[in-house]
Amino acid sequence: MTSHLSRADLSVAAPIVEFAEAALAESGRDIDEFWAGASAIIHELGPRNAELLAKRDELQKRIDDFHRENPGLPDKDAYRALLTEIGYLVPVPEKVSVTTENVDPEIASMSGPQLVVPLLNARFAINAANARWGSLYDALYGTDAIDQTGELAPGREFNYTRAAAVVERGRELLDQIAPLTEGSHRDATGYAVDGDGLIVRTEGGDRRLADPAGFAGYTGAADAPTAVLLVHHGLHAEIVIDRSGRIGTTDVAGVQDIVLESAITTILDLEDSVAAVDGDDKALGYRNWRGFMDGSISESVTKNGRTFTRVPNADRVYRTADGGELTLPGRAVLFIRNVGHLMRTPAVLDRNGEEVFEGILDAIMTSLGSLPELEGPNKGTNSRTGSMYIVKPKMHGPEEVAFAAELFGRAEQLLGLPARTMKIGIMDEERRTSANLKAAIAAASDRVVFINTGFLDRTGDEIHTSLHAGPFLPKALIKQQPFMKAYEDRNVSIGLECGLDGHAQIGKGMWAEPDLMHDMLEKKIAHPKSGASTAWVPSPTAGTLHALHYHQVDPMAVRATLTPTGEEALDALLVPPLAGEGDLTPEVVTQEIDNNVQSILGYVVRWIDQGIGVSKVPDIHDVGLMEDRATLRISSQLLANWLQHGVITEEQIDDSLRRLAVVVDEQNAGDPNYEKLAFADGDKPGIAYTAARRLIVEGAAQPSGYTEPLLHGLRREKKAEQASA
């Protein structure tokens, strides 16, 4: 067990002390003053945090009582009256004007993909930071974005026919983003630069760009550049020229690759994609964050028998046509996602020996970890405007947003940072925030840099809020219901109404099928078409492919065509997606039980046994799906809802758990660290299996349907078991 040390009137896990005091010493701040100030924040804001959680419980009780008395779809007027009476719906501010200052252009004015990655995994995090730039050729060749059958099938040997198809797609892109005055980039035999810009050599003569402003720079000699930099819709694309490369030697123009500016922002996550349950885990996350901020983070990687050190990429430097120099960031602008307001952590105990709120600790420690980038020798390497970007998840309504803003202000005072250095990204993923979004933005109108929708957590809260109204539809059908469209449309509309343009991102949710890139290219274009300036992707490769959508669609232009949502959208938002007569046939129910149980088991076993917070978990059909605590929340809440209404029984759940434990074990057979879920009759199930079952059968009792309270306790139990083995 991690030892604790006394600091002020706090008891602090030794790894947290070590992290904090090293950071304080380097920044020249007084250690005793810091701990005294941290204690003041914890003891003054902790009770307020608890009051906000108590209000959640009280509102939920009133809504539960209403649904018990009025089962089924509620009467619109009576339901609205209840929500207003109890303070669930608050008055809508007449006018909200976002005034956030010192925001980097990647957030304020550019559009492009966004990665989310667990901060406890340094290798993943470095890869995500470096996903600012990605090879289009690699992304196309290595995925199903290009047909993988017949003569295009990838194999052990390099497939030049497949490569030719990749090159053709690349030329299509160049013609789209940098059209010529005449002809096509397919006709190019070479590229050169002069004082007037880019020259495209062809057999029919030299050509110019139809829009000369599309040329941004080059590297190498002007008459034989090694790279040509283009810009389109605010995103850059680099034509890599190497006539000795495997592709370049076969390309008449010597084009070896096209490198796209891809994930312009990345969220390093301390929340849903990590398993951080104690002082050791929390300190690892804080150290990794500081490693990005001071430039020291690195990771040794072994690949194909070769070991090398992976570090964040350097900036990219180009020459311009007029002889000047252009420097572009080599890395994504980094957000850090703190946890929400719910959980306490044993990493720090207050003066009464009680665990402190984890979100308060995160605000203090992650801002401390940002000091080298905000004021030290590494200043400006993440934010060139002097800001720190924090995504704050799972907030319920404007009061909780205001509390987060106050907490950030206190952390700034503690560290002597300029007011409003710490910016806030508001996750619009809880129903009370969605219903009061304008007021929520108003509560942080001078800090907000991001609002974002997410189907999974939002649906998890939808189910839990209306748990007693009746049985919900299966997961796949919930997404198609009117409340979801209202949710997505209102997020963009209200964000624009509040003036987020030029100050903040409007974001959309995750593509959860990392192996299905063809489908992603077909479907995820809907996000920029909605007017959203960013959307989540599960991998650097997906980021590069999703970047294509922002060349096809300019979200900023889309916004000019949008019609504001009205009161009817709020009405639609408040209609729970309950199942109708005939929706829940025995076949549908059986399949949905197994689908959700499979998802829960496959995710929880890695979370509990190995501390892995995000996984590509094979579903019942062996399709790999990205799973994190948000997917766990919706799966467990749906089954809890069906149990509550007698659609299913505990016996059915137990039967599915026992059968699918065997399947999940088989799917993980290649993992040497895996511990089996299946157990013989009469034997005691393991902790992971127990966790999966409890999340379902106790789901109705979990606060807002969250999975963290059960997971954290059982993960600590597993860590203790492993330590004593």
Language-model segments: which ranges?
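N-terminal-proximal low-complexity accessory segments that begin disordered
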Residues: 1-70, 77-90
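Catalytic or ion-translocation cores adjacent to nucleophile or general acid/base/metal-coordination motifs
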Residues: 2-10, 16, 359, 382, ...
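Catalytic alpha/beta active-site cores
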Residues: 2-3, 78-81, 85-403, 410-417, ...
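Hydrophobic alpha-helical scaffolding
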Residues: 6, 10, 49, 53, ...
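Generic recognition of stable, solvent-exposed alpha-helical segments in well-folded globular domains
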Residues: 11, 15, 19, 33, ...
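Generic, well-ordered alpha-helical scaffold segments in large soluble proteins
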Residues: 15, 19, 23, 37, ...
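Flexible, glycine/charged-enriched surface loops at secondary-structure junctions
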Residues: 73, 273-281, 375-384, 417-421, ...
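Acidic, glycine-enriched catalytic cores built around paired aspartates
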Residues: 82-84, 88-142, 146-155, 159, ...
